[in-house]
Amino acid sequence: MYFAIEGVIGVGKTTLARLLQPRLDTNLLLEVFEENPFLSNFYSDRARYAFQTQIFFLLSRYYQQNRNVPAMLEQNKHLISDYTFEKDALFASINLHGDELEMYYRVHEALAEKMIPPSLIVYLRASIDTLMQRITLRDRPYERNMERGYIAELNQAYDDFFLSNSRKTPVLVIDSNQLDFVHNSQDLDWIENRVRQVLQMAPFQPELPIDARSPEHAD
């Protein structure tokens, strides 16, 4: 079983994947993104560096997943990842235009045919204010010039993409605004229990309350 955690920049995908990995006894595949030599410049000048940044990410994500996902699944363990290959096209639709976007889609379509899709996507949602606060707190140098408008645009695009009823892969939606799964073990327990329930992984605890703090659903 292979499932992935998705969400906008700063929502806590990697942190949650790291925390769930030992609890669910899975292999862990984390996105390597800091090696992108165009990323810092992209956040300072999106129009100029968008195409280089997107193509680098596309090929990097393809290489990582095409090599690692099949190998890890052959180990007879579940796999958790902090990203999906398909989300790369979501960023491209925002950052690229015209001939560059058309060229990108052609390459993406050819590569996507070789990808193994996850059995479940855990979509972490958060408000723009929450995302901006978390981005500020983690203080990555290349994110210090992050524009609020860009995060707002991404947030809407992620909702449109992952909440679509036409999706083939089931999506478990977690509203993370009021959750602190880093410092509050009950919040992490709650998320773990929901993942186990959807994936039908034992031990699922049906008595664990699903309260109004975190509305979610599976599409």
Region roles according to the model:
Residues 13:
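Conserved lysine of the Walker
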Residues 136-146, 150-219:
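NTP-dependent small-molecule kinase module
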Residues 88-157:
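A glycine- and Lys/Arg-enriched "phosphate-lid" helix/loop adjacent to the NTP-binding pocket
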Residues 8:
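P-loop (Walker A) phosphate-binding loop of NTP-binding proteins
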